[in-house]
Amino acid sequence: MARLHSGKRGSSGSTRPLRTEVPAWANITAEETEEVIVKMAKEGKQSAMIGLILRDSYGIPDVKLVTGKSVAQIMKDNNVYPEIPEDLFNLMKKAINLRNHLEENTKDIHSKRGLQLTESKIRRLVKYYRNTKVLPAKWRYSPETARLLVE
């Protein structure tokens, strides 16, 4: 598939192994995995980082195979998922960093374009999350509120 804001195709990546059961060497139960996920989520780690830590430190290749649920679903079930979805939060952090950069480097037109693309992606995501009732209907993106939410 093509990239969103360019005419190029995406670079190739590795595919996940087609596995339907937990490997024999992964010796951790579903309950223990959920406890570790909830503990890390309470420490403030995002679901992607939790997945990396589980893979590298605990030897869990795929949380969904072990528990039957994704990391985000486990976090939602235990009420430790953040109010603002992580993808939207990360995009807002990126937009804030770009704004800080543009305050110091006012003539950087390439970063200005990147900020425009990032903020339009934020607006599309906000529209989606409002329609799916993840965010309140009156929630709007503005750089000032994003700065307050992120910091």
UniProtKB/Swiss-Prot annotation:
GO molecular function: small ribosomal subunit rRNA binding; structural constituent of ribosome
Transmembrane segments: none
UniProt region (Disordered), positions on chain: 1-20
Any GO BP: translation
SUPFAM superfamilies: S15/NS1 RNA-binding domain
Keyword terms, alphabetized: Ribonucleoprotein, Ribosomal protein
CDD domains from the UniProt entry: Ribosomal_S15p_S13e (cd00353)
Subunit structure: Part of the 30S ribosomal subunit.
Sequence similarity: Belongs to the universal ribosomal protein uS15 family.
Record protein name field: Small ribosomal subunit protein uS15
Gene: rps15
